[in-house]
Structure formats: structure tokens, C-alpha cells
């Protein structure tokens, strides 16, 4: 069994996780979460999003969060910046890495960002050009790679095309997102094989939601395909405001438990991660969405 010896976890809880919460979240609580996550050993954290508060009110205050966090050496603190205005705001906050997002489904693209896939990619061109000028790295996301809430099945060749376009534009890595969590291990392997014909596996990442309880199976399938970067969210926070009924991202604690069992190195401390998840869940007044965290807390 030829699995990666090391995996990089991309912690998306502070951005993708919190953006769907209904109640306002204090900047101080967001700062504490990011600091807790970096202290747990996560070396890539998506801190916030520079988008219009009209569209994503929970991401208001991202500049203050960046100003307040304790930035540790060797940790990447990234932000979503889907347009030039957002990129410029991120730059003012000292952000060294940003992410842009496209979709593999035309219907999802129209409902999520109000334009076609082709138009959305064209919008990123000035962002990528500005990023090159300022030596800011750019990561690309693709939504709905294994299914769409409006279009149903998504052709892996369409995903491969979007991934190739993002890479050619200058994205150093492309994260493949199963936004509504319908993917299975077999479909995941077929998807990666298709996308890897256009983009090298070492430049791909997996982003799985657990709607049907398949996220860990899909991560394992991805590991078998040579993928060594995965997005996850502490305590399983998050969902998708544009995909009705979609549950949260796969929990970071659950992914870590899987990887620890496979003796794959991550550099993340499980107990510190569980504590970080419990603290933010207490702030939000909700139960922890991680099964591993709940099991470990029950033993404590």
C-alpha cells in the first residue's frame, strides 16, 4: 500500500466553518480560534475572507482578525479573495496567500457567484496578475466536483478543465471540493484520475463534506491516489449556504485520527486540536461535530 508519508492539513474552520453561523461572532473569539489552531501545530490556516459583508456577514472583521492573531513562523495564514477589491484589502492586511474559488457546475456558479464558470475564471485574471506582482501565492478551489445540488452529476472532464485553467492562471494548488458531500470512494478515485491527466497530483488537494458519511472514505481513496493535502474544519464546523441540507466540512479531528492510525505525519497535536474545537463550540453554543473529539472527550 503506497500511501503518502506526510500530509498537510489545510484548516478552513475560521473561514469556511464560521461563515455559515447565524449569530454574530466576536473578532476576539475568531482570533482565539486561529491562535488555538496554530498552537495545535496546524501550519496552514484559512483565517477569513475579504468579500462583501452583504454576501457573507460573518466574514466582516477579517482585517481585524489578521491584525490581532499571533503569527507563528512557518505557519501560512491565508484568506479568500475572490476579486481584485478583495485582494487589495487582503494585501493591506499583510496576507501572503489568498484563495479564489470556481465551480465545476454552471448552475452552481450562477447561483453562488452570479456568473458562468468561464466568466468567473476571467474575473480571477487580474487577481492572479496582482498576486504575481506582490509575490502572493494563490490557491484555487473548485466547488461541486462530485455532484451539484442543481445539476446533479458533474462530469470529471469538466472538473479537469477548470483545474487546468486555474493552474495555468497561476494557482500553485487546486482544491477539489465535494460541496454537497455526495461523493463515494470509487467516484473520488475516478475524479482524481481524470483531473491528474491535466494537473499533477502533487498540485491537488481534497476538500470533502460529510453529508452522506463518506468524507473519510473519500480521503482514504484520495490517499491511495497519491493526494497528500486535505482541507478540514475543526469540530466539523461549516456547510454551504448555497447547498440546501449540506452538512459541514469533514472534521479536522476525524481526519487526524485517520492519519495517525495510518502512521502518516501531520505535525498536529490531537489533544490541543480537540481543545480548540471545544472552545469555539462553547462560544457558538453548539455541540462538537467531530466524532473523534466526542469520543476522546468522553474518555477524559
UniProtKB/Swiss-Prot annotation:
Pfam families: HMGL-like. GO terms for biological process: isoprenoid catabolic process; ketone body biosynthetic process; L-leucine catabolic process; terpene catabolic process. Residues 7-274 form the Pyruvate carboxyltransferase domain. It comes from Pseudomonas aeruginosa (strain ATCC 15692 / DSM 22644 / CIP 104116 / JCM 14847 / LMG 12228 / 1C / PRS 101 / PAO1). A divalent metal cation binds at residues 16, 207, 209, 249. It is an enzyme of class 4 (lyase). Substrate binds at residue 15. Disruption phenotype: Cells lacking this gene are unable to utilize L-leucine, isovalerate or acyclic terpenes as carbon source. Homodimer. Belongs to the HMG-CoA lyase family. GO terms for molecular function: 3-hydroxy-3-isohexenylglutaryl-CoA lyase activity; hydroxymethylglutaryl-CoA lyase activity; metal ion binding. Keywords: Lyase, Magnesium, Manganese, Metal-binding. The active site is at 240. Its EC number is 4.1.3.26, 4.1.3.4. CDD domains: DRE_TIM_HMGL. Optimum pH is 7. Involved in the L-leucine, isovalerate and acyclic monoterpene catabolism. Catalyzes the cleavage of 3-hydroxy-3-methylglutaryl-CoA (HMG-CoA) to yield acetyl-CoA and acetoacetate. It can also catalyze the cleavage of 3-hydroxy-3-isohexenylglutaryl-CoA (HIHG_CoA) to yield 7-methyl-3-oxooct-6-enoyl-CoA and acetate. This is 3-hydroxy-3-isohexenylglutaryl-CoA/hydroxy-methylglutaryl-CoA lyase.
